[in-house]
Amino acid sequence: KTIDQARAGYGPKVDLNLGYGREYTKNPATRPDSETLTRGEASITAKQMLYDGFYTKSEVDRTSAAANSAGYAVTDISERTSLQAIEAYLDVLRRQDLLELTQTNLQSHETIFSQIQQRAESGVGRQADVEQAQARLSLAQSNLESQLGNIEDARTNFQRVVGIMPEDISNPGDDCCDKAPATLDDAIKIAYHQHPMLRSALADHEASLAQENAAKSAFHPRIDLDLGASANNNVDGEPGKDKGLYAMFRLQYNLLNGGADMARVEQIEHLSEQQKELINRAKREIALEVRLAWNALENANNRLPGLKQRVEAAEKTREAYASQFRVGQRTLVDLLDTENELLSAGIEYTEVYYDRIYACYWLMQSMGKLLETMAIEQREEAITVANQEADTE
């Protein structure tokens, strides 16, 4: 609507004036007498701007840039909010997987405890082994209770961010990671071109430049086309009807305004310089965010293969130790330690696995591409300006 208001300056202004009443007149034309007449007035005027020093164009540019800035700001907020929702979503998945690991670990400890207890009751095992197995079983039960609390916390946080409780959620996989750029430099270039925070700052600067041009229009003349028609009755003490038509070109040129116009221009120029600094600050913040997300993704990518190998090795070790324990080649402590090692390896792998997925979405958000990656519609204003600038560049 503000853009429409600015564009209205291109159109004509038409006014209708009507008047009816009594008029008392005593002037040289009526002296020594006076006249009291019933006065009637009717007129219509039309004014069309022909030249205003590009004030109207500048106002249209300013309001358009301001609208685009607001659109990009909304997109930026949407991207950040979406990332928070993704983080909460992945945290629920993470806690579910960790819960499954602790449940499996508890089942293994229950099986071991049952076997050790049976051996002790039959006189083959020692009571100390039973107590050792009981202690590890209690720890596994405690770990399970802890994970149950963690998953409830994750579900509650998801509801706080998204507004609903998570139901039937699934692992998003590597779809987002497959869309990551090849290099850090590529990621920063994309962010400089597309990030809504930077686009908003650039649009604000465009608005300040347009505002500066609007202020400079005060140094130009204004030219209007004026058209008018009138039909009056009993005016100024003269009985009878009075009709008239006119068509005029009018030029208005301010010669002196006490320096107010120049002061206004200088004020806006200062504002424009401030907007440039905000653009530079936005670039620095965006580049930093991209680097942090990139480093997080690289770190996870580098760690995952080794952690996966650790889990596989821990599984093989547990199977081997279980077989060796049954023939007396391994102690109970050795067997219990393999269960804890497998749990520890699984937990660390799961943590880094979901850290990697989150880092992929974080990288997309830091580049301003998260909504696009998730196929979420953006504000029309932001898309229009982004496409125009992409064509220009």
Give residue spans per PLM region.
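Amphipathic alpha-helical coiled-coil segments
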Residues: 1-6, 77, 81-102, 111, ...
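Acidic, low-complexity, intrinsically disordered peripheral segments
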Residues: 24, 348-393
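Transmembrane beta-barrel architecture of outer-membrane proteins
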Residues: 39-41, 87, 132, 222, ...
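Membrane-embedded beta-strand positions in outer-membrane beta-barrel channels/transporters
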Residues: 43-45, 89, 224, 248-250, ...
